[in-house]
Amino acid sequence: MAAAGAGPGPGPGAPPGLEAALQKLALRRKKVLSAEEMELFELAQAAGGAMDPDVFKILVDLLKLNVAPLAVFQMLKSMCAGQRVASDSQDPTAAPLPTPSVPETRGRNKGGGALGGGPALAERGGRDGPGQRMPRQPSASRLPKGGGPGRSPPRSGT
């Protein structure tokens, strides 16, 4: 029941359940990424993307769950902007940059606080564009097909 590689933490007086949980956690931390994910992680590092393997695993899991890559990117961008504001609060030129984007996204997009990259594009493309065009396109494409069994298009009589 001695600490077998558990590292600094609970000593030999720790309950066996806690020690087993710590060992499982240590094993999980050692193998966070699968072989394919590790290869992708190494490629990302080679491309200059320095990131913790746990964070990379979260990103890969989000993409596996079919979360839109643009949404993941914009969420990371907004999170990094928040960190930049906190860390660069002494620099007067860095603080005004992220602050105008926060009220813009809240004012224009009612539910899209996380999407801070392009509120005008999301407003035009998401609400006005496809929202009005999509019902018109299928109805126009159905007319030449005949409309149903036994019916003929109106121009067939000529």
From Swiss-Prot:
Modified residues (Phosphoserine): 34, 152
Broad class of the protein's primary localization: cytoplasm
Stretch list, region Disordered: 81-158
GO CC aspect terms: centrosome; cytoplasm; gamma-tubulin ring complex; spindle
Family under the similarity heading: Belongs to the MOZART2 family.
Task of the protein: Required for the recruitment and the assembly of the gamma-tubulin ring complex (gTuRC) at the centrosome. The gTuRC regulates the minus-end nucleation of alpha-beta tubulin heterodimers that grow into microtubule protafilaments, a critical step in centrosome duplication and spindle formation.
Annotated protein name in UniProt: Mitotic-spindle organizing protein 2
Naturally occurring in which organism (per UniProt): Bos taurus
Top-level taxonomy: Eukaryota, Metazoa, Chordata, Craniata, Vertebrata
Gene: MZT2
